[in-house]
């Protein structure tokens, strides 16, 4: 859902998304499947998984699958140290009555975790670190996996979102006139990334 705000797709079959319908845990295994499929078809294309820390925790053991099967995926991990979509639901639809969303000390250092699997990891904590991290990932993404851990604000919301009991046509935050356009400005990055 993070990528849905900015990405522009210009070819068919280049975007996998749960479309806000149960997104947590979808991105990383979907990226592995896309990379395995591309590899089987002889396509040398980069595959990028943009995921939150909560979704990644649901199947982070698949780092082993990625390495064992030589599937060089770029993992862009948005780390807000909580179950972000759950927190956002509780904020928007339940009067900010927060319950069981905070990782506390249970959120690992994902860079160290990636490195334990032999995957390069980079932590991005300031807006000025973004460009070099992306260049690093772009330079290796076809041959080696890499994890980019973006430290973001605890209360960063993700749009669009489907309200409780709703369906795709009821998504909130999809007004084409107000959605940000890529490339993202430095000011927009500074709003998202921690200082």
Say what each PLM segment does.
Residues 2-195:
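Thiamine diphosphate
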């Amino acid at each position: 859902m993070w990528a849905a705000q900015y990405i522009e797709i210009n070819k068919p079959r280049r975007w996998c998304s749960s479309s806000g319908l149960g997104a947590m845990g979808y991105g990383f295994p979907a990226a592995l499947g896309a990379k395995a499929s591309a590899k089987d078809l002889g396509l040398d294309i980069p595959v990028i998984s943009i995921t939150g820390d909560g979704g990644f925790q649901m199947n982070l053991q698949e780092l082993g699958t990625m390495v064992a099967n030589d599937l060089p995926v770029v993992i862009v991990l948005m780390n807000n140290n909580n179950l972000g979509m759950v927190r956002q639901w509780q904020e928007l639809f339940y009067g900010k009555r927060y319950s069981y969303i905070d990782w506390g000390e249970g959120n690992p250092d994902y860079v160290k975790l990636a490195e334990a699997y032999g995957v390069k990891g980079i932590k991005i904590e300031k807006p000025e670190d973004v460009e070099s991290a992306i260049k690093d990932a772009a330079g290796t993404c076809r041959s080696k996996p890499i994890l980019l851990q973006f430290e973001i604000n605890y209360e960063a919301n993700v749009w669009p979102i489907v309200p409780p009991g709703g369906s795709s046509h009821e998504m909130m935050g999809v007004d084409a006139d107000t959605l940000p356009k890529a490339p993202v400005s430095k000011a927009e990055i500074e709003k998202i990334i921690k200082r």
